């Protein structure tokens, strides 16, 4: 099936049972941004966090992407609210809000000061800023780093939302 999907031009998920379970640094950035957007969607759309899931993709041209979707089959799982936020100005406001949310964590400076471990499974992340219910996260809340978004406390790393 995966060969057929690849031939048809579908992006392949980064996580593959036959591959090591480690994301690249751009994948960690995409994963962290996905979690911020999912949390913001929960506030904006009224979806519960356990009903929103993510999927991280490695595109053939080397770029990273993520998919945010609902996993519920009841009324909470309809795509109407998510589809509405995927269009133009609403999407822009959603992303801006998510990036704004990343600036501060109630566990700082401890959270943002964490050093990346050798397997890059844990870095600047915690239950207050990036962790989601584990049923929502394909990677079980590993490979997350808020510093990829806002930079770190000693400014040795610049995030995408750093001025």
List PLM regions with ranges:
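C-terminal accessory domains/tails appended to large, multi-domain proteins
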Residues: 1-163
